[in-house]
């Protein structure tokens, strides 16, 4: 059981954020705001959501993409982070698991996810 004051604080943190609904298996494009000195720029990270963890303001999601030379790159993003400029769902995937860690061992066509039609 969580403290009601902590829940109220977290609800206030979450309040103003517009976040689309996505699930594991979906391909998302996350726009990350990067500060370099006094300049800011936005960098996109596109990949498959392989896990969603936590609840409230501490909720995180893991995105995996295949980079150069077929090297898998995974990033864990806090869902309500100030550094996330936006999240866009590119494609909805049809999977039967909540955690898709098995994709780490798959390459090429074996790592494909069917599209969800709904």
Swiss-Prot record:
GO annotation (BP), single: translation
Organism superkingdom: Bacteria
GO molecular function: structural constituent of ribosome
InterPro entries (alphabetical): Ribosomal_bL19, Ribosomal_bL19_CS, Ribosomal_bL19_sf, Translation_prot_SH3-like_sf
Keywords assigned by UniProt, alphabetized: Ribonucleoprotein, Ribosomal protein
GO cellular component: cytosolic large ribosomal subunit
Pfam families linked to this entry: Ribosomal_L19
SUPFAM superfamilies reported for this sequence: Translation proteins SH3-like domain
Job description of the protein: This protein is located at the 30S-50S ribosomal subunit interface and may play a role in the structure and function of the aminoacyl-tRNA binding site.
Family: Belongs to the bacterial ribosomal protein bL19 family.
Protein name: Large ribosomal subunit protein bL19
Organism: Nautilia profundicola (strain ATCC BAA-1463 / DSM 18972 / AmH)
């Amino acid at each position: 059981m969580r403290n009601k004051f902590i829940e109220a604080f977290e609800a206030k943190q979450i309040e103003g954020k517009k976040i689309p609904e996505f699930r594991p298996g979906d391909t998302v494009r996350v726009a990350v705001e990067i500060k370099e000195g006094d300049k800011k720029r936005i960098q996109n990270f596109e990949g498959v959501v392989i896990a969603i963890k936590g609840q409230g303001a501490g909720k995180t999601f893991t995105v995996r993409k295949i980079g150069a030379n077929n090297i898998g790159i995974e990033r864990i993003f806090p869902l309500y982070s100030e550094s996330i400029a936006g999240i866009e769902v590119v494609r909805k995937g049809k999977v039967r698991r909540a955690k898709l860690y098995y994709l780490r061992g798959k390459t090429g066509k074996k790592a494909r996810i069917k599209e969800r039609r709904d």
